[in-house]
Amino acid sequence: MIEVSSMERVYQCLRCGLTFRTKKQLIRHLVNTEKVNPLSIDYYYQSFSVSLKDVNKII
């Protein structure tokens, strides 16, 4: 079993599939690149936890 401390949350844009390490990076991408209305941002991404050893493979 993987310990919680060895997990990192990542965020994925549902419009283009890009993955980001921070929610701030994702929001900046959605507003500036994808032109998403800031009031509806929650519908355009998903977040999930990955083990630290796999983070660099994903991003």
From Swiss-Prot:
Entry coiled-coil feature ranges: none
PROSITE patterns with a match to the protein in the record: ZINC_FINGER_C2H2_2 (PS50157)
Annotated source species: Acidianus filamentous virus 1 (isolate United States/Yellowstone)
Single GO MF annotation: zinc ion binding
Keywords associated with the record: Metal-binding, Zinc, Zinc-finger
Protein name from the UniProt record: Putative zinc finger protein ORF59a
Record flagged with keyword Transmembrane helix: no
Zn finger (C2H2-type) start-end: 11-33
